[in-house]
C-alpha cells in the first residue's frame, strides 16, 4: 500500500508500519545521488583504488568504505538467497586459498567454485589457515546443493580432507531403532593435487584420490571439464583467484591499497564475487552467459543497479515446539 508518493514510502497491510522503497537494499538511508554510488561500486569491482575515487568524485573515503560494506552486505544476502538455496548441481567443486597481505597483518581467503558452470560458491576470510577456515568454506559449499555425488578437488592442505569427511556426512538409515549413524555417501569423492616446489618453481605434481575410485574420479573430471585429456587439477579455482586479485585492489600482491579492516576486505569480496556470478559474462561459457545463467539460477545478465536493489524475501519463521516466545508471536502476527 502506498503511503507517500513524494517520499516513496509504503505501508504494510498486516503490521501497519511504513517503510521506504530502499529498505533492505544497498541504497537504504543514502543521501547521495544513486548514479554516484553505482559508479563508485563499479569502479571498486574493477580494482580502482579508494583514493582515486575520492579525488575523482570529491567523496570522503569513509563514505566510500561505508558504501562498500553496505553493498557487500547486500551482495551477501543475494548470494545466500540465490546460490545457497540448494539448487546447484555440485558435480566437481574445486577449492583453494590465497594469502592476502593487509596493513599490519595477514588474512587468508578460501574460495570454492563449481567447475561445469564456473559458479563461485562463496569464500571465507580468516586470520589463520586452519580447519575453522576450511570448515566454514565447506559449510557454504554444502548449502549450495546436494553433495551425494560431489567431487571435491583441493590442494595439498590436509584440512580439506578431514573437514570434508566431517561436513559431508549424512545419516545412514538402516531401519533399526535409534539414531542413525553418520557417514559419507557412496557417491562422494575427494581428490588432492600436491605440488612440490624447488626455488619457487613447480618441479613435480602428484595427484591422489582420498575417497572414491580413481576411475570414477577421472570420469567425472572428463565429463565436467569437457576434455578427454583432462587430469585431476585445480586450474579453474586458481584462475578464479587470479580474477579476484585483478578485480579487488587489496588482493594485489604488491599494492599500496591494502585493507586495514576485516570488514573492508569482506565487503569487497562479496561485491566482486556477486559481480562475477551475475554481471560478468564468462568467455568459456559462450553466448554472453554468466555463471549464474549456466547454473540455471537466472535467465538474464544482471546490472549493477539490479544487484544492489534486489529485494531479498524474508526468511521463513522457524518451527517451534512448546510455548512460543514473545518475539516469535509478534513475528507471526506481523506475517
Predicted regions and their residues:
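Residue-level recognition of single "structural anchor" positions
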Residues: 1-335
Amino acid at each position: 500500500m502506498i503511503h507517500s508518493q513524494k517520499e516513496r514510502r509504503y505501508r504494510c497491510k498486516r503490521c501497519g508500519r511504513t517503510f521506504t522503497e530502499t529498505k533492505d537494499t544497498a541504497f537504504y538511508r543514502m543521501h547521495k545521488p544513486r548514479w554516484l554510488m553505482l559508479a563508485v561500486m563499479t569502479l571498486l569491482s574493477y580494482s580502482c583504488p579508494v583514493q582515486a575515487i575520492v579525488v575523482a568524485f570529491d567523496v570522503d573515503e569513509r563514505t566510500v568504505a561505508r558504501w562498500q560494506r553496505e553493498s557487500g552486505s547486500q551482495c551477501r544476502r543475494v548470494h545466500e538467497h540465490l546460490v545457497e538455496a540448494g539448487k546447484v548441481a555440485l558435480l566437481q567443486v574445486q577449492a583453494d586459498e590465497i594469502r592476502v597481505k593487509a596493513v599490519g597483518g595477514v588474512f587468508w581467503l578460501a574460495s570454492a567454485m563449481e567447475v561445469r558452470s564456473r559458479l563461485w560458491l562463496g569464500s571465507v576470510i580468516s586470520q589463520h589457515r586452519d580447519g575453522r577456515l576450511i570448515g566454514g568454506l565447506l559449510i557454504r559449499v554444502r548449502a549450495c546443493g546436494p553433495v551425494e555425488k560431489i567431487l571435491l578437488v583441493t590442494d595439498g592442505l590436509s584440512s580439506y580432507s578431514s573437514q570434508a569427511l566431517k561436513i559431508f556426512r549424512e545419516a545412514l538409515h538402516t531401519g533399526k531403532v535409534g539414531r542413525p549413524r553418520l557417514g559419507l555417501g557412496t557417491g562422494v569423492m575427494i581428490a588432492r593435487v600436491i605440488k612440490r616446489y624447488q626455488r619457487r618453481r613447480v618441479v613435480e605434481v602428484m595427484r591422489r584420490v582420498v575417497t572414491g575410485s580413481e576411475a570414477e574420479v577421472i570420469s567425472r573430471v572428463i565429463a565436467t571439464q569437457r576434455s578427454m585429456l583432462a587430469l585431476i587439477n585445480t586450474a579453474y579455482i586458481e584462475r578464479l583467484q587470479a580474477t579476484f586479485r585483478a578485480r579487488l585492489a587489496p588482493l594485489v600482491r604488491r599494492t599500496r591499497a591494502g585493507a586495514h579492516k576485516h570488514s573492508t576486505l569482506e565487503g569487497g569480496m562479496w561485491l566482486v564475487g556477486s559481480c562475477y556470478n551475475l554481471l560478468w559474462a564468462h568467455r568459456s561459457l559462450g553466448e554472453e552467459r554468466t555463471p549464474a545463467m549456466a547454473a540455471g539460477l537466472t535467465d538474464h545478465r544482471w546490472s549493477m543497479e539490479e544487484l544492489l536493489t534486489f529485494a531479498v524475501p524474508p526468511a521463513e519463521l522457524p518451527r517451534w515446539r512448546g510455548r512460543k516466545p514473545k518475539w516469535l508471536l509478534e513475528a507471526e502476527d506481523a506475517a
